[in-house]
Amino acid sequence: MASSRVVLILSISMVLLSSVAIAATDYIVGDDKGWTVDFDYTQWAQDKVFRVGDNLVFNYDPSRHNVFKVNGTLFQSCTFPPKNEALSTGKDIIQLKTEGRKWYVCGVADHCSARQMKLVITVLAEGAPAPSPPPSSDAHSVVSSLFGVVMAIMVAIAVIFA
């Protein structure tokens, strides 16, 4: 009877923990600098693992900047869609709904072409493994490490009480 109770508790715990491990992450583009000119967004993005369901949060002064979602060709040439397609609230949240490459630029003056205000990321499927492990400070790393430790403890408890 006690062993079936342990198995039930372990099963419920695994379900709850697996939902925590796949929780969406909000990425503040540029961290504390936000969406601004003269910032290296390539370097900012390189150690992050973006997954379907995550959100990009663009924080900026709406009187000075905007955000356009563009394709790779428009990204390379810093060409923009019509102005009415710009995101311009100053706190734009973009949910990453599909996997693949995503491109974002600022459409104000020369911010994209001369001031490097552009971002390209690769979005992975929800359960896809990361191409390489991110640094330990990354949100996904912390959750994954915690999940691994908790799972090891639960397996050890199950073996002891089985």
From Swiss-Prot:
The keyword Nucleotide-binding does not apply. Keywords: Copper, Disulfide bond, Electron transport, Glycoprotein, Membrane, Metal-binding, Signal, Transmembrane, Transmembrane helix, Transport. Glycans are attached at N71. It is a single-pass type I membrane protein. Gene3D superfamilies: Cupredoxins - blue copper proteins. GO terms for cellular component: plasma membrane. Induction: Accumulates in roots, in a RAM1-dependent manner, during colonization by arbuscular mycorrhizal (AM) fungi (e.g. Glomus versiforme and G.intraradices); the expression level correlates tightly with AM development. Cu cation binds at H65, C106, H111, M117. Disulfide bonds join C78-C112. GO terms for molecular function: electron transfer activity; metal ion binding. The chain crosses the membrane at residues 142-162. Residues 25-125 form the Phytocyanin domain. This is Blue copper protein 1b.
